[in-house]
Amino acid sequence: MKGEEQRPREESQRIVCLRKRDEKEWPACWASQKPSPALQREDRMIHFPSTQWKISPNANHTTVGFLFSGALVIDHHKNPESASKEETNVCLRIKRPRARKEAWHRTEVEQEGVSVKGSPHFNPDPDAETLYKAMKGIGTNEQAIIDVLTKRSNAQRQQIAKSFKAQFGKDLIETLKSELSGKFERLIIALMYPPYRYEAKELYDAMKGIGTKEGVIIEILASRTKNQLQEIMKAYEEDYGSNLEEDIKADTSGYLERILVCLLQGSRDDLSGYVDPGLALQDAQDLYAAGEKICGTDEMKFITILCTRSATHLLRVFEEYEKIANKSIEDSIKSETHGSLEEAMLTVVKCTRNLHSYFAERLYFAMKGAGTLDGTLIRNIVSRSEIDLNLIKNQFKKMYGKTLSSMIMEDTSGDYKNALLNLVGSDL
């Protein structure tokens, strides 16, 4: 499309081309919010929900600004190269918002969400030497380890590990394991794994031995994108010589197994910004018919819709469902299911509504009351520190009236506390 190279590409964009016979009628069609049979894509019709419209005619193009389910259509350009007496191509440039709070899996996280940004003047060799000296001889300088590893990005830590091996002939992770212990060791080792390998390790540990930590599996599978899950599966097979899906099937059963496998297969359309209001209404009616309307529950209907629809679509489904059932989808799930299946379904809903709120809740309840769920605390701080931890911290304060740092200070101690606080950073 002409002139497109000059446009700044700050957000994720998609070009959608429509074919129309009469170029004079299409603005009115858009203004009336009704899809026209004349406006078609090669693969499907485009349906638009009720929304706000603003039309500004121009000699060269018509600008239409409206928001629907996270996508912003900013302009419609007539393509003069393909125009003819019978047909005009109309191209829509669709720009997705940078900070989408609800449709979590299309959010492009800004730098302000990252709490660990690494060293701007990074050199792995002196860092490796500092770590070697901190662990050489009798005793360990834990603070030196904290100062280096919590203030470097994961990519920088991998370079430090390579330099450590090259300079001293030792594996850094194994050396750290031999010098550290307890929760502090667990946190530092978590920092040393590449992100997908770390999450693969968490899944492996959740299933090995007697018993299964279903909550860990649910958290990871429900909150990651399709591409992230594919990378985790790849890392899992490389590190443990086993297929993640097969291991989940072997370690779980019933409807919990089905929803976990469905989530792992990544059937959700992460990229779709379109909502078909008719399909959303039908899904809401199907969910109502599968639960509140009948005696018993059609669990597979819930699983199919929750695990295969995009987040933007599900948000519309939840709205329609509440109108039909006079109660939220969360309340219906609580009344229709129980145990780990209930937890899995509710997690999908929470992640769909607001991913940052979900992680804030996980961190809060990891520290609330007697004892600390250190695995949950470590996993979520480490895995989100280079993605959106600052945004999670903001949501944490809104939800609970206290900062994440203050709760960590109250609930942890020693080197473990200091390392966590370094990763979290200031959230006053």
Regions found by a protein language model. Give the residues of each.
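Intrinsically disordered, low-complexity basic segments at termini and long loops, enriched
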Residues: 1-90, 101
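Structural signature for extended repeat/solenoid scaffolds and their inter-repeat hinge/linker regions
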Residues: 90-428
